[in-house]
A protein has these predicted regions:
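Flexible mid-to-C-terminal extensions adjoining Fe-S/redox cofactors in radical SAM and related proteins
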Residues: 233-287
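Radical SAM enzyme [4Fe-4S]-AdoMet core and its adjacent flexible, acidic
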Residues: 9, 95-218, 222-226
Length: 287
């Protein structure tokens, strides 16, 4: 779904209302794939950056992208606008990745080479940025991930702008959940530590013990392409995640009961609720 001009203008109105009242504004782009509507990304980011500059507000912007459309010209334009932190995901090396990540143009065309070439080209940039290369882990792909990490080191090992994020895949309620080769909690912990020890010369993203999910934070929300407001970018089909919508004047029409469900961890400091409020909410309402 492409965001309409009406929603774009509503977001700008919201920014006009909000930015003068804060000290830090963080804009994150997530999908779907945000670069399918690159013009809208650039329009809103540019507007937000100018507003922040005008009011002396610190501007931070992050993008999660599959990397397929992140050509060098687009990358440079985004970084110069202030989008200087990216996350790009691989499902192992080329052979393994192309089993799962196929092109929208052809079900027989893998995406690894295009994504890798785009990632490689970012090295040419003289700008300051950070790219987290997310590597998905399953119960059967550790060899493939190791192969990918060797390739990453040979290409980016001397550049401290690139980091590795090891992340196990999870069952999130999709139709193919039962087909996934999932790691147990203990297997995940052991495998990640094993890989970090083996590739200690790489930079790894450290989530830390005090991690708080963005969806648990009262001052964080997502505006979807249709103007719906959500808390979680994973549970997009969950009705409890539809907490309101943005109005034409930039104000937010919020359902307080739904909204507060996501921030319960800040009331009782329950670490499980802070780690993943979605899991807590689904568990509660399905019991």
């Amino acid at each position: 779904v492409r965001m309409s001009l009406t929603i774009v203008e509503s977001i700008k109105s919201f920014l006009k209302l909000k930015i003068p009242t804060i000290k830090l504004f963080e804009l994150e782009w997530f999908g779907g794939e945000p670069l399918l509507t690159k013009d809208i990304v650039i329009e809103i980011t540019s507007f937000a950056k100018k507003m922040c500059d005008a009011y002396g507000v610190t501007f931070v912007s992050v993008m999660t992208t599959n990397g397929y459309l992140l050509d060098f010209e687009t990358f440079e334009a985004l970084v110069q606008l202030g989008v200087n932190s990216f996350q790009i995901t691989f499902d192992g090396d080329k052979e393994n990745h192309n089993q799962y990540r196929l092109s929208a143009q052809s079900s027989s065309l893998g995406t690894f080479d295009t994504i890798w070439n785009n990632l490689h080209n970012t090295k040419k940039s003289k700008e300051k940025f950070a790219i987290a290369i997310r590597c998905h882990l399953t119960a059967i792909n550790s060899g493939s991930v190791r192969s990918l990490l060797k390739k990453i080191y040979s290409t980016f090992g001397n550049d401290n702008r690139y980091f590795i994020h090891l992340k196990e895949i999870s069952a999130l309620g999709g139709k193919d959940d039962d087909k996934m080769c999932l790691l147990s909690k203990e297997e995940k912990k052991c495998l990640i530590q094993e890989i970090k020890n083996e590739f200690s010369y790489l930079q790894f993203v450290d989530i830390g013990k005090d991690y708080i999910c963005y969806a648990a934070k009262p001052n964080t929300f997502a505006i979807r392409a249709d103007g719906t407001i959500a808390k979680c970018t994973v549970a997009l089909d969950c009705e409890l995640n539809n907490v309101g919508r943005i109005l034409a004047d930039g104000s937010l029409d919020i359902n307080p009961q739904k909204f507060l469900l996501w921030s319960q961890g800040f009331d009782d400091l329950d670490k499980l609720k802070l780690d993943c409020p979605y899991y807590h909410i689904i568990k509660k309402y399905n019991s």
